Amino acid sequence: ATYKVTLITPEGKQEFEVPDDVYILDHAAEEVGDLPYSCRAGSCSSCAGKVTAGSVDQSDGSYLDDDQMEAGWVLTCVAYPTSDVTIETHKEEELTA
């Protein structure tokens, strides 16, 4: 399946289709560019965002705990879309505050 992913970035809104077997960050890097990331392995917070609508599968990640994920935090480098989803990007400072 393919889902519509909407990224709310400091530069504005970006929308594109992402297959459910492709990490959102990997696809977004081709479509949007200029998204923050570091390890690309789900073990840091550089690419953190907040899901405001929809859902993702980020079971490959290890950095976030269950409470953070339930609150909507997402690591875009290890997140597959499981529905149409909206994510606010560039949220590392809020997550680590």
UniProtKB/Swiss-Prot annotation:
Listed A to Z, the keywords are: 2Fe-2S, Chloroplast, Electron transport, Iron, Iron-sulfur, Metal-binding, Plastid, Transport
* Gene3D superfamilies assigned to the protein according to its UniProt record, in alphabetical order: 3.10.20.30
This protein's GO cellular component annotations are:
chloroplast stroma
Q: How is the cofactor bound?
A: Binds 1 [2Fe-2S] cluster.
Q: Which organism is it from?
A: Arctium lappa (Greater burdock)
Cofactor(s) the record lists: [2Fe-2S] cluster
Function per UniProt? Ferredoxins are iron-sulfur proteins that transfer electrons in a wide variety of metabolic reactions.
Q: What is this protein called?
A: Ferredoxin
